[in-house]
Structure formats: structure tokens, C-alpha cells
Amino acid sequence: METTVTTFAAAHADTGDTAWLLAATALVLLMTPGLALFYGGMVRTKSVLNMLMMSFVSIALVTVVWLVCGYSLAFGDDAGGGLIGGLKHAGMAGLGPDSVQGTVPTLLFATFQLTFAIITAALVSGAIADRAKFSAWLVFVPVWTLLVYVPVSHWVWGPGGWIAHHLGALDFAGGLPVEITSGASGLALCLVLGPRLGFKKDAMRPHNLPMVMLGAGLLWFGWFGFNAGSALGANGLAAAAFLNTLAAGCTGLLGWLFVEQKRDGHPTTLGAASGAVAGLVAITPSCGSVSLLGALVVGLAAGALCSYAVSWKFKLNYDDSLDVVGVHLVGGIVGTLLIGVFAEKAMTGGTEGLLYGGGLAQLGRQAVAVAVVAAYTFGVTYAIGRLLDKVMGFRATEEQEHTGLDLTVHAETAYDHGVLGHGAPVSPSVVPSAQKVQSQA
């Protein structure tokens, strides 16, 4: 983010900057329903609604946490060591319509940041699709938001945050607090819950690829608000971030398809959608630091590397259902590290990457930030997951997973065609069974 210190000024907010950030906030909020469609199309028919619900309920849960204390802890004055903010603005206390953050109303800035927190939590759900206990997810999201997302956001963007102000690593729009935290958390929960029934044995292809493409399109559209909005103003930096976002999404798509064509002999719609997202993930931290040429390379590298990374789960035996690790963790690492290579003074205001004579110093700072955030996130998320699994169970029962979480947890099906799953007839005994196991969810 361009502005990291909360300020209050007598001057009025700039109307142009405010109008742009209002639009950007709405665009980023749209990304969560887009993600729901993207994920919903990738799962099997028996768990579509559950996947949608995990994203939509995250909107409500994270919003409440953010308004009560999350914003204050993330963006309030540093409480010491650059680790966490204070509770001065708990319940949004002291933030009225006249409060200004830079050139925009503070309440708008807080809402913009809220939309980032929402989609980050929702992203994690893709790693545990088809097998997570819904009631456990309702507890996990607020706890994870407070213990993982909020501190990391303060480190990167908050007043006095240690990554930005002491280490000197750069992250324009969320490679560390959004992409790497969601990916590392997804990996941790994969290990806590274990693989789906039939992993590496049964075909688990996306059930609705047009739905996946629609979701990817909405994500791409919203990403312009995500990245260009992080300039916090209607200015040249926002324009550069906007164009870099478009460029990296395109080369990410092409890079993934190139690998598919060479490796598998055919480009796929799933590959196109995933490649675009991989490029967008990688440009998120770097869109305000690299030139257009750098953005093209960042997207291409992410698309190609992530297309290989999504297959690691079969070799290493972790079931990352919807490739959160392969796309968001790997893509986030690629984009964050490449700042140290392609950063230009004209974009950053001073910092230069290796390619432009800056040496290895900035690359080293980026690497330290990546390592610390990934390790902290993985460790804390794994601990939360293990605790919830012990206290209330984090994994759905085998009966729920076999029948499908839509019917057994939500008492609904996405497609009311008299069939459940891949053409399997619905037994009359399924509905009573669903009502019985619903009490366990």
C-alpha cells in the first residue's frame, strides 16, 4: 500500500481519490463471489454449495472480526516492535466521517482493507474442499484472521510494521499477507485434514468448467481494484499497477498453456483460467514496483512454474484440492522475490532490483520476508487446525464425504435433477441419512 501510517487531518479528502477507492473497494469485494464460482466449478457436483458457502460465510465472519478489533490491530499505531497494532480503534472508535487517511476517508480505507482480509480467508478453503467440517470452518475463519492475517498485515502495511519499516521489503498489494498466507495456510490444513477419500485413485475433475471460467473472469476484473486500488489514489501509480496487472494475467495464461501443450499435448480451459490467476497472484506484490516489461516476465514465470507446482501434491502426497498451494503460495513467492530482480527506481521512488544495478540486497530482503511469513503462517495455522480437530473435529465424517457435503450438511443440492454426484441415483435413504449426520457437522 502506498500509505501505511494512519493520519487524521482537518483537510477534506480528495474527491477523485475517494471515488476511485470506492470503486476499487467494490471491485475487490466482487472477487469473493468470483472465487466462490471459480472454486465451485472445480469441485464435484456433490459439494458445490458447500464450496460456495465457505466463501460467502467468510464475508460475514471476517467483516465482524475486522470491525470489532481486526482493523485496529492491523492498522492502528504500533504497540511495539512492529509486530501488532493497538486497540485504540476497536469497534472503529474515533473514526468518523471527517477522519482522513492520506487523501481518502479513513472509514473507506478500512473498508478497502477489509475486502482483502475477506478474500484471503476464502482462498484457504480451496485447499480443503470436499472434506472440511462446516462448523469447524465457522470457528477457524475468525481465529485465523486474528492470529495470522491481522499480524502479517501489520508487519507489511501497518504503521511501524517490521517488514516494511525495519527490513525494507516491498509488497505493493498483498503477496505476503494475501497470497503467501493463504497458500501456506492451505498447506497446513491439507496436512491436518489428510487427503480426500479416493485421492490419487478416483477422478476428481472439475464438474463445471464454464463456471470456472466465469469465476476466473470475475477474479481478473476485481483484481484491477485489488492492485490499482492499492495506490490509494487516482494517479499515475494506479495506472501503472492497472496495466501491469493486465499484462501479467495475460502472460501467466500463455505461460501455463505453453507448458500444457508441451507436456500434455493440449491446452485446457482449466489451464487458461489457472494460468491467468497465477499471473495475477505473482503481480500482486510487484505491480507497483516493476515496469511493464518486468510485469510481462513476472506473469510468464508464474504461469509456467505454477503449472508444474500443482502436480507436486501427487508426488509429495498432500491433497491440495483446488491448488491453493501450487498457485497462491508458489505464485506469491515468485512475485515477491522477483521484486528484488525487476524493481525500478521510477516505480519505487528509490529501490532498485538486481537487473537495474541494485545488487542482491533487495532480493535478500524479499527472501527474508517470504521465509518468515510462510513459516509463521504455516506454524500458527497448523496449530489452530490441530486444536480445532481435537476439540470439535475438523474433518467431515466418511458418510458425509461419500454422500456429499451439499446434501448432508446443507440439505440442498446444486442441481435438482434427481441425481447426486456423477450420475449416481439418489437413494431414498440418503435424505434421512443426511438429516442424521447434519447434527454432526
Language-model region placement:
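Glycine- and aromatic-enriched membrane alpha-helices
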Residues: 2-441
